[in-house]
Amino acid sequence: MENGETKVGRECEVIIKSYGIANPQWTRKLNDSPGWMRLGFSIYKSLKDFPFVCEVFPSASYKMLEKENLVYELCVNNFTGGVKDMLDASVAAVTVFEFINGRGCKVGGEDGLGTIVLPRKIFL
């Protein structure tokens, strides 16, 4: 994507935007990132030795699953501190479950900046 004269956006974000699945906030470089994004970068880096790590874009998952009547159990203990964050975390877990069970896909990766897992397949 272009922002003024600068091209921004990881390939995975551009794909999600181009399919109209969600409207991602373009990922910044580490040095240009706010604190919460730096924390995310450090968590991702600390997980480098895990067999696989999935990045999920919850807004894309909500859009792809909105008419599927997908049901899952959710415990609401400790929700008062961040309802939206807890819902996003739960749909992220469902998204990875759907992906691992062959119903989803991952997009991006050709630019070396990671992939995003989606709960349903799209055809590029």
Language-model features, listed with the residues they occupy:
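Phosphate- and other anionic-substrate recognition elements at nucleic-acid/protein interfaces
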Residues: M1-L124
